[in-house]
Curated annotation (Swiss-Prot):
It comes from the Eukaryota. The lineage of its organism: Eukaryota, Metazoa, Chordata, Craniata, Vertebrata. Belongs to the KRTAP type 10 family. Keywords: Keratin, Repeat. Sequence repeats lie at residues 26-30, 31-35, 52-56, 84-88, 94-98, 99-103, 104-109, 126-130, 136-140, 146-150, 168-172, 178-182, 183-187, 202-206, 220-224. One of its GO terms (cellular component) is keratin filament. This is Keratin-associated protein 10-10. In the hair cortex, hair keratin intermediate filaments are embedded in an interfilamentous matrix, consisting of hair keratin-associated proteins (KRTAP), which are essential for the formation of a rigid and resistant hair shaft through their extensive disulfide bond cross-linking with abundant cysteine residues of hair keratins. The matrix proteins include the high-sulfur and high-glycine-tyrosine keratins. Residues 26-224 are annotated as: 15 X 5 AA repeats of C-C-X(3).
């Protein structure tokens, strides 16, 4: 076979991964076995008529524009390889969900618009989160073992606590009942679209009701200027519910 066909000899040959004339028994399909000296552009056209090579896939609309952005040992995915990657050296052996556009798949080492990772590549057990894969993540070490609701980061996706908290969770209007034990005091930068879920860990006690009372517990509640007006606990003891103005509550 002529070297112009870009066939690549397999490891069964004497000199592995060479672009040379080699026998049929050790010839790999064109553009399917990357070598450091090759530009990884999947356009198998010269292999069609060769008995030593088989085309990796049928020509497609996106094939001509597919160029790998990965390093040499990285697993690649394209429209001619529809099976998604299960692990990739580029992603530290993580299971990598991919966002596939109809007809043409996006390479896993690129970062398309709808593919948002929740953790860095340095974490060996990280998982990736994407708005195209709505049930991808269950827990991630980068989020301190918190369950991360899958909701595209927008005006309605506002974290309530910092990543340093081991019991933190994320809260958003897309997942209104997300938090179980998280601070419910939104700051001025929090969107009003985000309805906080109040729990006792961050609530403000009412002095007249005792230290154990909390604004998030229905027995004794208080609304403060720092607490969102959207968060309104139900009070079972009306006399104990005082507004900022000092008036009694009607609840």
């Amino acid at each position: 076979m002529a070297a112009s066909t870009m066939s690549i000899c397999s490891s069964a040959c004497t000199d592995s991964w060479r672009v040379v004339d080699c026998p049929e028994s050790c010839c790999e399909p064109c553009c399917c076995a990357p070598a450091p000296s090759l530009t990884l552009v999947c356009t198998p056209v010269s292999c069609v008529s060769s008995p030593c090579c088989q085309t990796a896939c049928e020509p497609s609309a996106c094939q001509s524009g597919y160029t790998s952005s990965c390093t040499t040992p990285c697993y690649q995915q394209s429209s001619c390889q529809p099976d998604c990657c299960t692990s990739s050296p580029c992603q530290q052996a993580c299971c990598v969900p991919v966002c596939c556009v109809p007809v043409c798949c996006v390479p896993v080492c690129n970062k398309p618009v709808c593919f948002v990772p929740t953790c860095s590549e340095s974490s060996p057990s990280c998982c990736q989160q994407s708005s195209c894969q709505p049930t991808c993540c269950t827990s991630s070490p980068c989020q301190q073992a918190c369950c991360v609701p899958v909701c595209s980061k927008s005006v309605c996706y506002v974290p309530v606590c910092s990543g340093a908290s081991t019991s933190c969770c994320q809260q958003s209007s897309c997942q209104p009942a997300c938090c179980t034990a998280s601070c419910c005091r939104p700051s001025s930068s929090v969107s009003l679209l985000c309805h906080p879920v109040c729990k006792s860990t961050c609530c403000v006690p009412v002095p007249s009701c005792g230290a154990s009372a909390s604004s998030c517990q229905p027995s004794c509640c208080r609304t403060a200027s720092c607490v969102s007006l959207l968060c309104r606990p139900v009070c079972s003891r009306p006399a104990c519910y005082s507004l900022c103005s000092g008036q009694k509550s009607s609840c």
